[in-house]
């Protein structure tokens, strides 16, 4: 049995979420299971559910931005953390931060204001 958009939104509400929160989601389509319509349905559900809040997904590029490839293009550089963030960053109304290796994408309430300062956070080597 495949999940539907309605199932996903119901499950979010069942977790006690209201949709007006600020939420950072680290995602995995494999962990979600089979969804009618695939990744686009998951993103539709998240964006509709959190329409009054702020939805954040990491759009990290650390796998691609390195000594050999130092160029980061906020509009074109693909992310390396899954299909959901990659599709999310390309959707209308989603804004992406300027951090060259650990960017974030945001949608919803005050998304542009949140993203405007997020790239200034330090990322230190481990």
Whereabouts are the PLM-identified features?
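N-terminal basic/disordered segments at the start of proteins
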Residues: 5-8
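Short amphipathic alpha-helix with an adjacent loop that forms part of the alpha/beta core around
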Residues: 12-14
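N-terminal active-site beta-alpha-beta segment that forms phosphate/nucleotide-binding
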Residues: 16-69
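Flexible, glycine/proline-enriched loop segments at strand-loop-helix junctions
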Residues: 32, 70-76, 113-119
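Glycine-centered helix-coil hinge/cap
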Residues: 38, 50, 82, 105-116
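General beta-strand structural signal in soluble alpha/beta enzymes
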Residues: 56-57, 96-101, 116
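Ligand-binding beta-strand-loop-alpha-helix segment within the catalytic cores
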Residues: 69-108
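Conserved small/polar residues in nucleotide/adenosyl-binding loops
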Residues: 120-126
